Regions:
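C-terminal alpha-helical interaction modules of replication/initiation AAA+ assemblies
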Residues: 10-21, 25-27, 34-176
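Conserved AAA+ ATPase small/helical "lid" subdomain
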Residues: 1-13
């Protein structure tokens, strides 16, 4: 606790009275981000442009961190989330309401996960999820084949296509 509280001394001048909002602001900036927190940001009850902005902010934090900042790790985490969403949609297909035992046996034991995937299922249809999984595979292949030169741009475009276009690829303008 002493170690954690000592961070506040570096953030504020001597004699400053730290408020709850100050603590929240410091802790939110020190929170460790991952593909899973990015998935949560994609689900927020905000307009798509704001969800994209928040997801891009998390992407920047991940890329600047020393731990798990590889695009392959980021994409793998998102693939895991969208595969679980696909499983959730399959369990709930055709109006079927699964029991708690059925949900737990499929990996949705916590109420938080159940709320998260119920919210995601309202945002993306099974068709969208299939398109997003294909997009994630395409982006992974492109990043592995082109190297690190354009990886940030490719990840940014991928997030745009997931959040604003529901997995549809951006059209390319071609001239003769």
């Amino acid at each position: 606790l002493r170690n954690e509280c000592s961070r506040f001394f570096m953030c504020f001048p001597a004699g400053y009275k730290v408020t709850n909002s100050d603590v929240e602001q410091i802790l939110s900036h020190n929170r460790e981000e991952s593909a899973f927190t990015m998935f949560d940001a994609m689900l927020e009850s905000l307009p798509p442009a704001k969800r994209l902005e928040n997801s891009l902010s998390i992407l920047q934090k991940i890329l600047l961190s020393k731990k798990d900042n590889s695009p392959v790790v980021i994409i793998a985490g998102l693939v895991s989330c969208f595969r679980r969403l696909s499983m959730w949609q399959t369990i709930h297909s055709q109006g079927h309401i699964p029991s708690d035992i059925e949900l737990k046996s499929n990996g949705f034991s916590s109420k938080t996960a159940q709320r998260q995937y119920a919210k995601a299922a309202k945002l993306w249809t099974p068709g969208h999820v299939a398109a997003i999984l294909a997009l994630l595979a395409k982006t992974d292949l492109e990043i592995r084949s082109t190297g690190s030169l354009f990886q940030e741009n490719q990840l940014t475009l991928m997030l745009y296509e997931i959040i604003l276009k529901n997995g549809a690829y951006c059209a390319r303008y071609e001239t003769d």
